[in-house]
Amino acid sequence: MRVSFLVPVYNTDPAILTLCVNSVLKAAAGIHEVVVVDDASDRADTRAFVDRCEKAGIDGLRIIRNSGNHGVSFSLNQAAHAASGDFLAPVDHDDVVVTPGFNQMLRSLAYHRSRWAYSDEIQVDEKGFLIRRMFKPDYSPQLLRSLMYINHLQVFSKDLFEDLGGYREGFEGSQDYDLALRMSERCTPLHVEEIAYHWRILDKTQSRSGEQLSASSVDNGRRALEEHFARKQCVAHVAPVLFKRHAHTEPEPIGVYRSRLAANQDSKVSVIIPCRLGTTKRINDKPLVLLEHCLQALGWSFVEKEASRVELILVLNAGDDLKKGEEAIVRRGL
């Protein structure tokens, strides 16, 4: 198993970029590959750092330069296209890969024969100090449809990535979320309970400015989720959840979405009632025929237009009279 780390670069502080590249080179350990794509940086010290990396002639380090500034999705696709590994691991240009956690991911992928895995991570500030640890749950499709909790580090099959067409341009800021939703339609990701990534939270990135998420990132995440439901042939209304961070500020999106799925008008529900005719029980000193009581409650529950989509199945004892069972249903108008 060979992994290609994909590192898109644009106007990155060389000090932070040095930490990032050194961390992935350490994790690569001369076995795996690191593909750095400079998306036409106009910052001189960033370009100078990329030049030094190229001239260093480090085994397993490849440098690609885009002819223009095309965005992160384009850059990641360029890196993936050039990658020689059979697995891919995207890494943000200001983050750090933790070697022991990455190695555990490789062992888990091999043991479980999985095509996609994600790890736990920690968030750090601009100087690398701990903000919070993020210990994630195992895969939950419902949770993924609410927020992009998988995040970093992800390692997934290049074949899977290419089958899906890679990252989609136009989803910048939420391109990882869009890809994760599409991959989840093909396979189930494996959660590796190891910290393999330091996610650096900067004041200003493509997806956020300070605490506030960018409007384009939130909207792209909403579109990715809506299209996911459409591919699943579900009708859903998706809206970002708003949260008031401070007493003096307006509610704002926090990267969480609420999806309301419309009921399928053609679907039917089968209500199965195993019973013995004539069975009674005293409730509040009042004898109740259990089947009659059950059917009465069901009748109260359905409106007329719903009743046509409900099927009642009575499972009676061998000695019971089927005709009496049918009569009980008719009496309740079901």
Residue ranges with predicted function:
Residues 38-47, 68, 92, 313-329:
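A conserved acidic beta->alpha catalytic loop
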